[in-house]
Amino acid sequence: MKYYLEITLLPNPVINLLTLWSKVFQQIHLGLVEMQDNQKRVPIGVSFPEYIIGEKYSVLGGKLRLFAQEETTLARLDAPKWLSRLSDYVHCTGIRSVPEKLNGYAIFQREQPKISKERLARRYASRHGIDYDSALLRYSEMAHKLIPTPFIRLKSLSSDNTFCLWIRKIAVTEPSSNTFSSYGLSATSTVPEF
């Protein structure tokens, strides 16, 4: 990845950071969907430079970076256009070259923890054709599990359901391939850290 642009979420008393993340990431996701190839791969990856991993919880911070191999790829995305209705709440830099001195690389991937009794029961009920209450009994003994991974709450435009996009960071020493999902995430592709 040779080029990037950075989006900073601006502190604001009107809208909290979690709500702002939802609005910003929804717009970036829509822009990335427009750039998918026929195998649903995207040439732009995301990183969260202020991501902090803790034992009990982690945070995304207030910055988002978009990376691409070519400057024209980021120009084609046109992130400021996608974020225009949020211009009072975000600052978007121009396209810049990635610095030569890096701290390493990271993989930002989607994590789908199976923690919610309710979610598991809904899924079980729909798969096995039983009612929700019966399915919930199946998981009644399940202990509550705290997931420290940070997330962004998004709304599916196809199903109108709200869901959490859990984002896990893995630090690595070597770069790897450059294709990502329509969320800019990947289980194998890296982005530079600086």
Predicted features by range, described:
Residues 2-4, 41, 59-61, 147-149:
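A general secondary-structure signal for short beta-strands and their flanking turns/coil
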Residues 115-167:
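C-terminal low-complexity, charged extensions that often adopt amphipathic alpha-helices
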